UniProtKB/Swiss-Prot annotation:
Its main location: cytoplasm. Induction: By activin and retinoic acid. The keyword Transferase does not apply. Binds 1 divalent metal cation per subunit. Most active with Zn(2+) and Mn(2+) ions. The physiological cofactor is most likely Ca(2+) or Mg(2+). It comes from Xenopus laevis (African clawed frog). Pfam families: SGL. The gene is rgn. This is Regucalcin. One of its GO terms (cellular component) is nucleus.
Amino acid sequence: MSSIKIECVVSETYKIGESPVWEEKEGTLLFVDITGQKVCRWDPSTKKVQSVSVEAPIGSVALRKSGGYVLAMGNTFSALNWEDQSVTTLARVDEDKPNNRFNDGKVDPEGRFLAGTMSQEIRPAVVERNQGSLFTLYPDHSVVKHFDMVDISNGLDWSLDHKTLYYIDSLSFKVDALDYDMKTGKSSNRRTLYKLQQDEGIPDGMCIDAEGKLWVACYNGGRVIRIDPETGKQIQTVKLPIDKTTSCCFGGPDYSEMYVTSACDGMDEDWKKRQPQSGGIYKITGLGVKGIAPTAFAG
């Protein structure tokens, strides 16, 4: 097996870095700073980060087929025009829950944008329970709710045959699997795939590799773990030099690099001194596996 190398490629510290997405056309990495209320784009060739500020906490960003990006921010699905930095609301959710905000999201293989909500954090990973839901934004901008009673809606991705949705509600400390109808975008038969061990931390963002295995970033666990959905077993752990790992995606010219976002929110001065690059973006190479290109929102 090739030797694994971990490096901090963006040392600017973000409060809650999240939602990394590789944009192949530009050769750049998109990500958000949730409470910093920014959409960011890092160019590996220049090592520079460009960012656009938005007016609400932003949980996730995705590519959009017609250009620009689609966002799950505040209680809205919105579109971002990167060139003029304008944001347009496409749909609203949870209007009866003013304390809720969107969190993680991802586009399914048919071009629908799924994202979930949670109540605003009292402090990191502490929320009013059962306030969140998982939603789909369809290309015609209609919205459907999959289920509610969620604590912190988080990582999601699809099996390589597109028949299974993998999903994380962080405070359940589990990775779940659901049957997924790719024709309709409906999900059913939710079940537990993997329960995290105590030392692994809180399951956060997630992505799938080209071998159909899941990679889960573990908040406060300082690691990404690889899970085999066939057996429900954890088969690999990659530890990072920071505790607050938040999400992961594959990228680079051939999708052989893994990018991991992190947070520094809630860390005291002593903790920050010990881990000064918390809130940075990390690149992991030498994993010996490649990822899958992200799908763009079709609407």
